[in-house]
C-alpha cells in the first residue's frame, strides 16, 4: 500500500507518487492508496463503492420484502380489488379471495413449516361454474393481475391424451412458461385458467369401453399436474421429441382455476333434491332463471360426478364457486362501472384524439337489450359496441375539428351517424 505525503527528496517523491485509477487523485491527496495489478484505488473511492453497494443491497431487500408482502393480500383486499373490475358475483368473489389467500399463504409457509410436525396444507384449486359471459375468465385474469403472477388461459376442448392429435396437458405449462418470460421461479407460482372444463366431462356416469381421448382421458391426464408433479416441458412448446432438452416445471405451487357453463347441471341437482325429499325420482319440470340460480348454488361433488367429472378430478378441486346469470341491471353496470369498462376504454381512445366521447343513456339501454337477445352475457356488450364504433373510429383521425362525439340511440338501432360537436357551441350532424 502506498501512502500520501511521503518524505525524502523531490526526485524520490516523484517516483513514489501514484494516482488513483478511478478518481485520478494523487497519493498525497488521500489517506491511503491500495495497489493492484496495473491499477491503484484510493480510500475515498473505496468508501464511495461501499456506500453504493449498501444502497443497492438496501433497495433489493426492500423490493423483496415488498414482493413477499404483496403475495399475501388479505381476502377482503382481494375482494375489494375484484370489485373494481367485476360487477356482482359477490359469492364467487368471496370464495375466490379465500382460496387464493390460502394458496399463497401455503406457499410462503413452506419455508418454515416442519415436515414432520406440521399439518400438510393441500392445494386449493378452484372450480368456477356459471353461464357464458358471467365473468369467469375475467375473475381469474384479475386475480393474476392483483397478485402480479404469470397467467395463461387454456381451452379444455383443445386438449387430448398424450399420443393423440391435439395439445397434451403439458402444453399448458409451456404456455405459462412463455407468460413468465421463461422465468421458471415465477412460472411455478403462476395461475392457469382452464376454460370449458365441462366439455371434457364423460357423456354418462358409466365407464365407457371405448377410448375417450378428449374427455375422461384428459381428466386423467390432468390429475398429476393439478395435484403437484414435476413435468418436463419442451422449451418452445409443442410435442416432446427424443433427446430434446426439457425444462422441469414443478406444479405443486401453481394455482389451477377451471371454469365452465355446465349446462344441464341444474337438472342433475334438481333430480337429487327431489329424490332426497320424496324418496324416489320425480318428473323434472323446467326451472325458472331464479330457480336455476338457487339450484346451481347447491351443487355438490356427487352432482359433478353425475354430470361426468371423475371423482379424482373433483377431489383436486376443493373450492367450488358458482356465478349467477347477468340481468339487465348487471349488464348496464358492467358497461359503465368497472375500472376497465368498455365505455371507459372507448372514451380513453377518443381522448387520445382530443375528442370527448359521450354515450346517451338511451343508447346504453339499447346496447344492453341487444346483448340480452344474443344470450352471451357480458361478451355481447363488447360485440354490440364494436359493430357501432368501427366506422366512427375509422373516420375520426381525419376529423380534426371535432371536439365531441355523442353516441345516440339511433346509432345502435339504425347504425346512424353519431352527433358531432365542433367547437364550443356548434352541434352538427355528420354528413
Swiss-Prot record:
InterPro entries the UniProt entry points to: AAA+_ATPase (IPR003593), ATP-dep_Clp_protease_ClpX (IPR050052), ATPase_AAA_core (IPR003959), Clp_ATPase_C (IPR019489), Clp_protease_ATP-bd_su_ClpX (IPR004487), ClpX_bact (IPR046425), P-loop_NTPase (IPR027417), Znf_CppX_C4 (IPR010603)
SMART domains: AAA, ClpB_D2-small, zf-C4_ClpX
SUPFAM superfamilies in alphabetical order: Glucocorticoid receptor-like (DNA-binding domain), P-loop containing nucleoside triphosphate hydrolases
A GO biological-process term: proteolysis involved in protein catabolic process
Residues covered by the ClpX-type ZB domain: 6-61
Gene Ontology MF, one: ATP binding
A Gene Ontology cellular-component term: HslUV protease complex
Binding sites annotated in the UniProt record for ATP: 131-138
PROSITE patterns according to UniProt: CLPX_ZB (PS51902)
Keywords assigned by UniProt, alphabetized: ATP-binding, Chaperone, Metal-binding, Nucleotide-binding, Zinc
Keyword Glycosyltransferase in record: no
Binding site for Zn(2+): 20, 23, 42, 45
Function in brief: ATP-dependent specificity component of the Clp protease. It directs the protease to specific substrates. Can perform chaperone functions in the absence of ClpP.
PANTHER family, A to Z: ATP-DEPENDENT CLP PROTEASE ATP-BINDING SUBUNIT CLPX-LIKE, MITOCHONDRIAL, ATP-DEPENDENT CLP PROTEASE ATP-BINDING SUBUNIT CLPX-LIKE, MITOCHONDRIAL-RELATED
Subunit: Component of the ClpX-ClpP complex. Forms a hexameric ring that, in the presence of ATP, binds to fourteen ClpP subunits assembled into a disk-like structure with a central cavity, resembling the structure of eukaryotic proteasomes.
Family: Belongs to the ClpX chaperone family.
This protein's name: ATP-dependent Clp protease ATP-binding subunit ClpX
Amino acid at each position: 500500500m502506498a501512502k500520501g505525503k511521503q518524505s525524502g527528496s523531490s526526485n524520490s517523491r516523484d517516483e513514489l507518487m501514484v494516482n488513483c485509477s478511478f478518481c485520478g487523485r494523487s497519493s498525497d491527496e488521500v489517506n491511503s492508496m491500495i495497489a493492484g495489478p496495473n491499477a491503484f484505488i484510493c480510500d475515498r473511492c473505496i468508501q464511495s463503492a461501499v456506500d453504493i453497494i449498501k444502497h443497492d443491497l438496501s433497495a433489493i431487500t426492500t423490493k423483496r420484502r415488498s414482493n413477499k408482502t404483496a403475495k399475501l393480500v388479505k381476502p377482503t383486499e382481494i375482494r375489494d380489488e375484484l370489485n373494481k373490475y367485476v360487477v356482482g358475483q359477490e359469492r364467487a368473489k368471496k370464495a375466490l379471495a379465500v382460496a387464493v389467500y390460502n394458496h399463497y399463504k401455503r406457499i410462503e409457509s413452506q419455508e418454515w413449516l416442519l415436515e414432520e410436525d406440521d399439518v400438510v396444507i393441500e392445494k386449493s384449486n378452484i372450480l368456477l361454474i356459471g353461464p357464458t359471459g358471467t365473468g369467469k375468465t375475467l375473475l381469474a385474469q384479475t386475480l393474476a393481475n392483483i397478485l402480479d403472477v404469470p397467467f395463461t388461459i387454456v381451452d379444455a376442448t383443445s386438449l387430448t391424451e398424450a399420443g393423440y392429435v391435439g395439445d397434451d396437458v403439458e402444453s399448458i405449462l409451456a404456455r405459462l412458461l412463455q407468460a413468465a418470460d421463461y422465468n421458471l421461479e415465477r412460472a411455478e407460482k403462476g395461475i392457469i385458467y382452464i376454460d370449458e372444463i365441462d366439455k371434457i366431462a364423460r357423456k354418462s356416469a358409466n365407464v365407457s369401453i371405448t377410448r375417450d381421448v378428449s374427455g375422461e382421458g384428459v381428466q386423467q391426464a390432468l390429475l398429476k399436474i393439478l395435484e403437484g408433479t414435476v413435468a418436463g416441458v419442451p422449451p418452445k412448446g409443442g410435442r416432446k421429441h427424443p433427446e430434446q432438452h426439457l425444462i422441469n416445471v414443478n406444479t405443486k405451487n401453481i394455482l389451477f382455476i377451471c371454469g365452465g357453463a355446465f349446462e344441464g347441471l341444474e337438472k342433475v341437482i334438481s333430480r337429487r333434491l327431489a329424490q332426497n325429499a320424496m324418496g324416489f325420482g320425480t318428473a323434472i319440470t323446467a326451472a325458472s332463471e331464479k330457480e336455476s340460480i338457487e339450484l346451481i348454488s347447491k351443487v355438490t361433488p356427487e352432482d359433478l360426478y353425475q354430470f361426468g367429472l371423475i371423482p379424482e378430478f373433483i377431489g383436486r378441486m376443493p373450492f367450488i364457486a358458482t356465478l349467477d346469470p347477468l340481468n339487465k341491471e348487471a349488464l348496464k353496470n358492467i358497461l359503465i362501472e368497472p375500472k376497465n369498462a368498455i365505455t371507459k376504454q372507448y372514451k380513453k381512445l377518443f381522448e387520445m384524439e382530443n375528442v370527448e366521447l359521450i354515450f346517451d343513456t338511451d343508447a346504453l339501454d339499447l346496447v344492453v337489450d341487444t346483448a340480452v337477445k344474443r344470450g352471451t352475457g357480458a361478451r355481447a356488450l363488447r360485440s354490440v359496441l364494436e359493430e357501432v364504433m368501427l366506422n366512427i373510429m375509422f373516420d375520426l383521425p381525419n376529423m380534426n375539428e371535432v371536439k365531441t362525439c355523442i353516441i345516440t340511440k339511433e346509432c345502435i338501432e339504425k347504425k346512424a351517424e353519431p352527433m358531432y360537436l365542433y367547437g364550443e357551441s356548434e352541434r352538427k350532424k355528420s354528413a
